[in-house]
Amino acid sequence: MNFNDIETMVKSKFKDIKKHAEEIAHEIEVRSGYLRKAEQYKRLEFNLSIALDDVESTAKDVQTAKSSANKDSVSVKGKAPNTLYIEKRNLMKQKLEMLGEDIDKNKESLQKAKGIAGEKASEYFNKAMN
């Protein structure tokens, strides 16, 4: 074996190693991207959990307000003030009902979004690990 043969063999092996290293670097880059996405979805899921807790707290407050609105706490003598009070109370009950329905819809949307974010986080984490 002369020097040229050895040099050719070493260069060939170096090219193989270099190509393999580039493939590994690319794979690391791809998996790192998946991990970043998984982390972002986990953060989103956490933030949605906080928002969901806030919505549930608001729903409880609205439910308490609706219960309070059903109680007659004012006794006004005379027909006109009572009529005005009853109309305003009924309007308030109606608005609280609408608000309660909107809160329930928002709660459902947040729960769905949280579930999707959790699924995506798991999906990207699994892609990064496989």
Swiss-Prot record:
A GO term from the CC aspect: extracellular region
Subcellular location: Secreted
Coiled coil: none
Keywords: Secreted, Virulence
Domain of life per record: Bacteria
Free-text function comment from the UniProt entry: Implements its pathogenic function during infection.
Stated family: Belongs to the EsxC family.
Oligomeric and partner information: Forms both homodimers and heterodimers with EsxA. Homodimerization is calcium-dependent.
Protein name: Type VII secretion system extracellular protein C
Highest classification ranks of the organism: Bacteria, Bacillati, Bacillota, Bacilli, Bacillales
